[in-house]
Amino acid sequence: LLYGAFAAMAQTNLRRMLAFSSISHVGLVLLGIAAFTQQGLQGAIFQLLNFVVVSSGLFLLTGLLHHRLGSTDIISLGGTARSMPLLSAFFLLFGLAAMGIPGTSGFPAEFLILYAVITTHTGAGLAALATVIVGAAYFITLYRRAFLGPASSSAITQADDLQTRELFIVGLFAILILVAGLYPASVLNVIDASTQGWINRL
């Protein structure tokens, strides 16, 4: 958890930042399972589903950014939101879901895991909570440097925003994130019986 979060904070490339943050998120899943409670297991499964959607969306947008600009290094970016507002907005939405902001699919997943871990092992729960805070710090910092401010090159000012086909695909990810975040019962009701059975067998 902590290694992935602090390593992500030290990166200067969006792809490497996403790779190290993935390590941190998988660590959170393992911690939820290790709590050996139904809430922890539900949170772990929810987080896995959230991780698949959010990480896929972020890596897809990063790939589209690389296709347009030829680089995902922070030093080559900056001011991207001016010429690519849709791409920047979706990247922010997916990042907020990765941070576990209320209203996104990341919130119920992280809440269940943190609740389960804090009630079963307070020290591990506090470490996980610290990781969530660090995760918010590195994402906001890299997003500000990569997407906000003045454009750093003419390639950025002339870049095209999301096309119709790209917008359709990214929009599907966004819908899944918002539906699962605003109506988490749509996921929890499906996995309730299996998680309860798993806990009972333990």
Residues covered by each model-derived region:
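Hydrophobic transmembrane alpha-helices and their helix-loop junctions in integral membrane proteins
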Residues: 1-145
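Cytoplasmic/organellar membrane-interface segments at the starts of transmembrane helices
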Residues: 84-87, 139-202
